[in-house]
Regions:
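C-terminal catalytic lobe of FAD-dependent flavoproteins
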Residues: 158, 166, 312-408
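Glycine-rich Rossmann-fold phosphate-binding loop(s) that bind the pyrophosphate
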Residues: 21-23, 45
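Helical element adjacent to the flavin cofactor pocket in flavoenzyme catalytic cores
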Residues: 154-214, 218, 222, 366-373
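Glycine-rich FAD pyrophosphate-binding loop
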Residues: 34-55
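Helix-loop-beta segment of a Rossmann-like dinucleotide-binding subdomain
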Residues: 101, 138-181, 209, 287-288, ...
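Extreme N-terminal leader/targeting segments of oxidoreductases
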Residues: 1-17, 35
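Dinucleotide-binding Rossmann-like beta1-alpha1 core, especially the glycine-rich loop
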Residues: 58-143
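Active-site substrate-recognition segment that forms the wall
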Residues: 217-352
Length: 410
């Protein structure tokens, strides 16, 4: 401690659970813990939802896109019921009330070009997908595809799309007194004699030692640095990079859909997001974004223009604005850097009271919270403290979506 530090301004504060990371996973967990009676708080060093959460397309899907190889995978089976689960929350009948969250679309489409139509038809005739998809034709087609030039097949999925900033706002609003902005330049972990960790927070002349029965890391890519600071021996994190493409235009039709290609990953995934100036952004993911991770921005934009001109040649994007966004999907390490099938949470090695957690996809944030509550229960960690600790820290802002930042649409 510096010689001029006034020890009279030092104090210990207690809470049951401290969550580090204010994305969807951390905010969802905060709700679940408070509902279970825990005195929980959340610390975020940036804006709530920043990085991976707001970079998401907002899809709540039931895994159909993971079955495009023709097989039911662990990923597909793990999340088959998630659209229904989230839908109950949006209706106010689930474990968290999300009635104020903006729903961008209550369905998602899967469409094919003429060259892949037979594959799509054969697959969706199987029992594996029965009740989860419906074929649409004629006037049932989305307006974007109601043109003579379109000759592919279209299926309507039970998946839905949420406005992620709206979701973050809805989750954060009821619990603002428990959400704090932390500056890791003036805060650090302390290893206690019993092997547990506390967090020392310096604010002005005040020093607080925040003691918690458990610390839960839900900081996405930031978990790696936090685990390093803690001296944790496990788990190890992997990242799988993407480079998404954003197209700002004034074409009238909103669209949410996957285009089936020759690979297991959709050729391109399109979600639509309104801008304040009346235009909209098509946010492009799928194989285009996965392959785009190794490309420069200009090269990827050229590929995206070619893809859209092949798939939707009747859409005039000649006056559109284009941009790209690099995204790192943070996950627990898998063999051959494969995509994880399920949410992950476990106690960190060499840390008595630290859990490392990754939802691995937006859809599974509720599953992650359930896993963490079970870990706490199994270890016998029960609610002990009544009210949130007094921390002289401000409440973080809500992160802006990437199209607002990239196109100046704030």
């Amino acid at each position: 401690m510096p010689a001029n530090f006034d020890t009279s301004m030092s104090s210990n504060v207690q809470t049951d659970i401290t969550i580090i990371g204010g994305g969807i996973a951390g905010l969802w967990l905060l709700h679940r813990l408070c509902d279970a009676g825990y005195n929980a708080i959340l610390l975020e060093n940036n804006a709530l939802g920043s990085d991976q959460s707001v970079a998401s397309q907002g899809m709540i899907h039931g895994g159909i896109k993971y079955t495009l190889s023709g097989l039911l995978t662990g990923a597909s089976q793990a999340i088959a019921d998630m659209p229904g689960y989230w839908r109950k929350c949006l209706q106010g009948d689930g474990e968290i009330d999300l009635r104020g969250c903006k729903l961008l679309s209550d369905h998602f489409y899967l469409w094919s070009s003429t060259t892949t139509t037979s594959r799509l038809t054969t697959f969706f005739a199987s029992k594996a997908t029965r009740g989860r998809v419906d074929k649409v034709t004629g006037q049932q087609l989305p307006p974007l595809l109601q043109v003579p030039e379109f000759r592919g097949a279209v299926y309507k999925l039970v998946d839905m799309v949420l406005d992620v900033p709206s979701l973050v706002r809805q989750l954060a609003a009821p619990l603002q007194s428990r959400i704090f902005q932390i500056d890791w330049k003036t805060a650090h972990f302390q290893r206690l004699p019993n092997g547990c960790h506390a967090i020392e927070i310096v604010s002005g002349e005040q020093r607080r030692q925040l003691n918690s029965s458990a610390i839960v890391l839900t900081a996405g890519q930031g978990n790696a640095e936090l685990l390093k600071q803690l001296g944790a021996t496990s788990p190890t994190m992997q990242t799988r990079p993407l480079q998404q493409v954003l197209v700002k235009h004034r074409h009238p039709h909103r669209f949410f859909g996957h285009c089936l290609g020759a690979e297991a990953t959709p050729r391109v995934t399109i979600s639509s997001h309104a801008c304040h100036d009346g235009s909209q952004v098509w946010y492009l993911g799928g194989a285009l974004a996965e392959k785009g991770a190794s490309q420069g921005s200009d090269e990827l934009i050229h590929c995206a223009k070619r893809e859209l001109s092949e798939l939707l040649p009747w859409v005039d994007l000649s006056n559109a604005q284009w941009a790209t966004l690099r995204v790192e999907r943070a996950e627990p390490l898998q063999r051959n850097f494969a995509r994880p099938d399920q949410a992950y949470a476990n106690w960190a090695g060499n840390c008595q009271n630290v859990i490392a957690a990754w939802p691995t996809k937006l859809t599974l944030a509720p599953n992650l919270a359930t896993q963490i509550v079970e870990l706490l229960t199994t270890k016998g960690i029960k609610p002990l403290y009544a009210s949130p600790p007094a921390l002289a820290l401000k409440t973080p802002d809500i992160a802006h979506p990437p199209w607002q930042t990239l196109f100046g649409d704030n």
